[in-house]
Amino acid sequence: MKKIIVAAISLFTLATLNGQVEQQSLPGAEEISNRRSSFNLEEIKVRWKKAALENCTGVPCTTGPGGGSFTCGTSTVADIDGNTYNTVLIGTQCWTKSNLKVTKYNDGTAIPLDASGGTNGNGAGETWSARYTSSTAAYSILSNEPSNGTNATNYGFLYNWYAVTNPKKICPAGWHVPTDAEFAALVSYSTNPGNKLKSTSALWNPSVPGAGTDNFGFSALPGGERAFSGSYTLTLSGDYAYFWTSSPDITHPTVDSWQYAIHKSDNTTIGRYSTPQESGDSVRCLKD
């Protein structure tokens, strides 16, 4: 194994890809007392992470990619496309603060885009699946806008359940699509979750003034849904936000799964529905 020779230092060093050594200030790192020490790269990584964790004061606090610290509510997380998401701590759960808008799984494989906008999921060229006929993973964008359009910016993308639960993983590394139980824990965290998890944004239907108070920073927006038929329903009306979980409905697990819905005028509760897996919903990611 290739060794890296480190001169006498009081703090750790980190090797670059070019074999160079860059000195880093890491308070709390174990002091190297001998004049010349030989470390392999894996040893350096282990010590780097140990020092970062010991000096991280946030709650929760873990080592992030490359050994850096992560503090939920302050730190951000990026998906494989480079989109950056703010984070929010609600109880003991760390959530992304906006909806997912990634086009690839974590291994770089593209998620099929369905931009047909048709009303029949079996139409020519469509990858969106009519119920019971297919299990093709896909995502779409409201009104079939481009990925940098206003709707994509505001609401993220809509994914069917096959994309959400693909083993290649849709959330950033170290994050996952919440289970039914995990989303239920979010809903039960406080009273009147329909109001407190809803954004104060005017994107919600203005017929219900002050529809959200966003007490915790979850900032749910009315991204609507794409029906299993391929048509967009309750979309851009400002009425609903739909979120997938990774949990199938055990009474008919091959066709339906659990989603949560926030309605414009329901400030007390958040709906939980068994929904066709071909439907397109928003996705929030939860830290492992």
Could you describe each region identified by the protein language model?
Residues 4-5, 20-70, 77, 284-288:
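Enriched but not universal
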Residues 56-288:
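Conserved positions within compact, well-structured domain cores
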Residues 3-11:
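Small-residue packing motifs within transmembrane alpha-helices
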Residues 1-4, 17, 33, 39, ...:
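Generic cytosolic/nucleocytoplasmic N-terminal low-complexity/intrinsically disordered segments
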Residues 10-18:
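Hydrophobic h-region of N-terminal signal peptides that target proteins for export
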